[in-house]
C-alpha cells in the first residue's frame, strides 16, 4: 500500500491556476483567499469537499469545489458573465499539479442572487467536481 497524500491542496491550487489563466481580469480577479476590503468583481474558491473513491489500499477522491463570485453594478449581467467565464475555462479542462492526476471537472450547477441590501451587489456560487488521485 502506498502512502496517502494531500489531494485537497493541489486540487485547490490547480483550480485557481486554471481560473487565473482563463478568466479575463476585466471580468474579475481570482483568489484562493479574499483579503478584507477586496473590491468586487472577484471569484474565490469556497468550500472544498473530498469523498473517498478509492478501493482498499488505493487513494482516489471525488473533489467538489464551490466557486464564490461577487460583483457590483446596476444588474446581474457582470456576475453571470464572470460565472460563465469560470465555467468555460474549467468544465472539461485539464487540471495540473505535481504528483496528482485529475479527471476533467464537471459542472454541477450554479446559483445567482438578487441584489444585496445595497441594491448593487450580486453574488453567485458555481459547483464543480472531479476525481483526483496520486500520480
What would you call each of these model-derived segments?
Residues 59-73, 122-132:
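Oligomerization/assembly interface segments of phage tail-like spikes and tubes
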Residues 18, 25-26, 88-135:
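Acidic-leaning, charged glycine-interspersed low-complexity segments
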Residues 6, 10, 54-58, 73, ...:
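Residues at secondary-structure transition points
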Amino acid at each position: 500500500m502506498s502512502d496517502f497524500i494531500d489531494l485537497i491542496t493541489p486540487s485547490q491550487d490547480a483550480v485557481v491556476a486554471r481560473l487565473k489563466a482563463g478568466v479575463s481580469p476585466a471580468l474579475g480577479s481570482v483568489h484562493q483567499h479574499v483579503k478584507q476590503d477586496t473590491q468586487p468583481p472577484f471569484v474565490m474558491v469556497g468550500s472544498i469537499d473530498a469523498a473517498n473513491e478509492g478501493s482498499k489500499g488505493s487513494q482516489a477522491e471525488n473533489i467538489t469545489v464551490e466557486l464564490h463570485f461577487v460583483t457590483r453594478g446596476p444588474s446581474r449581467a457582470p456576475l453571470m458573465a464572470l460565472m460563465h467565464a469560470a465555467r468555460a475555462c474549467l468544465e472539461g479542462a485539464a487540471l495540473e499539479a505535481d504528483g496528482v492526476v485529475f479527471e476533467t471537472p464537471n459542472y454541477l450547477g450554479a446559483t445567482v442572487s438578487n441584489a444585496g441590501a445595497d441594491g448593487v451587489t450580486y453574488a453567485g456560487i458555481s459547483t464543480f467536481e472531479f476525481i483526483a488521485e496520486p500520480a
